[in-house]
């Protein structure tokens, strides 16, 4: 929040029309340009360093309005004169500016909500490594898990209409619609069963943001009913009027959802149901029988079909036994296994040997998908054999090349340091280290053996010290407010940079 002090000082009484003037502010595009919204750990955006002109951006916006189009198709791009001058760069800059502006809007709403709660600073962003104590505590008591692929909106216009409920600025929304349809660069009809990578690679963060707003619409209904039902179960009889009022509201929802809502009210009374969503995937886990999981499954299908006009593909929603199924979550393969132990107990003159089997959580690094990601970026081949990458060494010094490989190795160890087995991490380090040496040898037209002798043991020590530095990270202790926020059922993770590692196929 400290990064946006000048934006958060805006007049909050003009929430409906303060967005449009920000489009012409140079610091908006500087912020999106300097922070590198599209950076990736495995791919470095070399085109992001291109210079841009705010004057050209203003002219493009003016000419967009002069076109007087509501939708710009892919065939119209050749006829529009304002798109002939470096079209991709400036459309990308405008969309990135929109991404910063709408995030500022949500930051303002977050600050106002925190001020009402008398919380000075938000501590509810947690690292990925805080998930493992949660999984160790909760997952051994669960029995069934279901992976669901969140469907995409049928039409791109639905994303824009969803944003209309949050942004009350017609001018900004009109320009936003024109830019988004043009940057989409093909038909706005989305017919795909692939992952969320279908969004344009030029500015995926903005489309992720729109997609999350769209999913939030039905999640808000889901969480409202779940929290209210769970709250009313634990209240005393003197709040019976509130209970009756809430059930009356449920009856009104039947007209909205077009299904028999009271029949599925029992679903929200399950205290052991866990709901997790990340990227385009959601996970349901429960302690009870598969029958309850099937009810949850058909409830989500009916909710999406009747109210949001999307299809969840129920034939691809599988209910798996957690003890026999590995959970693919945020780049980890998590499963629990029985850890047998023998305890000897003695009472007076008699001794007993007790076999005790405890459930233990295993978090495994998926080595095959990671090798595939490294192969796509030319660090190794498909079987994991390190190769040189001459394109990265063309205009870089030796120190820059080594620093780039060390940074990638550090990020890998940081992200996967919660793994229970480190053998796969050492294999990844071997691939990166040898690929770095081969890249340097190819640059200097030398052999790997000669270059290893030239670098000496200091080169290996840099990789070892980087690993030790990462694995010995000491995270700051959280305050009392942070601990109280940690007890909530909704989780927020501060994973903002390492996107490629947690992508699911």
Curated annotation (Swiss-Prot):
GO terms for biological process: mRNA processing; RNA splicing; tRNA processing. GO terms for molecular function: RNA binding. It is found in: Plastid, Chloroplast. One of its GO terms (cellular component) is chloroplast. InterPro entries: Domain_X, Maturase_MatK, Maturase_MatK_N. Disulfide bonds: none annotated. Keywords: Chloroplast, mRNA processing, Plastid, RNA-binding, tRNA processing. Usually encoded in the trnK tRNA gene intron. Probably assists in splicing its own and other chloroplast group II introns. Belongs to the intron maturase 2 family. MatK subfamily. This is Maturase K. It comes from Rhizophora stylosa (Bakau).
